[in-house]
Amino acid sequence: AMMASLSSCGSDAGSSAVSSGSEPASSGTESSASQAESTSGKLTDTPVTYSYLRPENALQPYTDNCETVQKIAELTGINLDVIIVPASDWATKMNTLMATNSMPDFFYLWTDVKEITSAGALLALDDLIDQYAPNIKELYDTIPNLDKATVNGQIYALPTIRMDENLEVGATPNIRVDLLEELNLDVPTTWDELYNVLKAFKENYPDSIPWGSRGEYNLIRSYTSCVTSLGADYNLYQDDNGEWKLGRLEENYKEALAFLNKCYAEGLLDNEYIITSAQDWKSGLASGKYLFYYDNPTFINSFNTTLKETDPDARIEPIPHLANSKGETRAYGFANHEFNIFGISPDVENPELAIKFFDWLYSGEGALLMNYGVEGQEYEMVDGAPQFKAEFIEEWRGKSSDPYYAAASEKGLGKLFFTPAWYSQAQNAFMTSSPDDVTAEYIYHVYDDQRDVIVDQPVQPPYTDEEAEEIQKINQNLDDYSTTEVNKFVTGERSLDEFDAFVSELKAKGADDLVRIANEAEARYQASK
């Protein structure tokens, strides 16, 4: 449980249950064993409170004591004490809680699982899963690569599992197609063609910035950043032979930075991209400040809705992936599942009940509640599948230009709240109010001819404790330095003539050791299969 600084968040599970291996509480409250024999159908007959901490998201602010939190208590006997931390302070707050041994019971991981495990801030889950979590056990038995999401062969964090078909295509190039038509320009098919389009935008629309980015991470460091499309990688990746490499050491990363630097120097790329928040970026696209972006295309509808209020012809659309300077077209998709997302504190009261609760969240009942709400109120079953009720959708369309996130904010639904089991298409029903809407299905079919272009993001092999500790130390040396220097290359503060020196600096900080450890762990993993 967390210390007095967040005292309202602490678990009171100790008043009603006992940890594994301890004696029953002196107050005569029920033990874990008796709770396992609940007569009410709940996970526990005696109410238990667990704290859950995650970062805020501007798209979906949390509503206190929302409907799903109330329903969880009714169905399971577990009260969730939800703590939302400002996104800007999230990593700092979590590092402080970890350093002071004050972790919440459940939390959203903020950094690499290996780092948190090395600090002793995650509960080992294997034995608990084997004994108390059949739904979770089945996931690890059936989902490819999920067994890689371990440290020293043990499970320390739980995944977000997609429960329906993946219509997501990853980050894409998205552009004001109405302006292409206005200037009689073809849709660009290569990055060089896009550069010329952006130059035309700058010349003809001087009050706008041709290219806007949601901060520097989404521009140059994320697996789904435009760097991949430009033919490079920033992070660890596997080449065609299965060998792990660190992308930012490679010459093709320098070439990607050179393109970004050219766009920055000519005012085509927003010169304030480093300090641009997600909300400011969204506002910029919805107001016409930005005319192109490379990021998640599912935001397009909300942008277009606002744009059309002042310009009925305005329209952002996704376009096919662009070929790089070598004529190659490549992109990482959004993963079917996301590994190592949720953690449980090693100090959690009654870990058996805690893992049972997560197992319930992965169950049909839990998944439907956390994605769709209450049956008969927010959704109904149609041909065996959940569908939001038409009147619920229309109610929220009348309240907000971004109806899904507004509804999810009030009710406590979806991936931006607490969904270990995630229905990724749940929000699509809110996006089909007009034939002109850019729906998930529409976006999916834009890339019908590029399915082989969109590949899975790399999944690193499982590491031993010693490897994890060494990787943590190396990344501490590399991460902040890499971020600072890479942004200097983009902005021109550092010349790309010094890229080889930058690579040497990274190697001096342990980059080669990082690659070596990844390849040794991969060889060990492959030999064990």
Give the predicted meaning of each segment.
Residues 4, 9-193, 221-227, 234-237, ...:
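Conserved N-terminal structural module of periplasmic/extracytoplasmic solute-binding proteins
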Residues 46-50, 76-81, 100-105, 120-121, ...:
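Loop/turn elements at helix/coil->beta-strand transitions in domains of secreted/extracellular proteins
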Residues 55, 360, 365-484, 493:
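Conserved small-residue motifs centered on glycine
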Residues 109-112, 295-299:
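Beta->alpha turn/N-cap motifs
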Residues 116-127, 154, 303-329:
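Ligand-binding "clamshell"
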Residues 152-221, 237-284, 289, 293-296, ...:
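Helix-loop-helix "hinge/cap" segment bordering the ligand-binding cleft or interdomain interface
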Residues 320-333, 385-393:
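Extended amphipathic alpha-helical segments with heptad-repeat/coiled-coil character used for oligomerization
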Residues 323-327, 336-346:
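Membrane-embedded translocation segments of transport machinery
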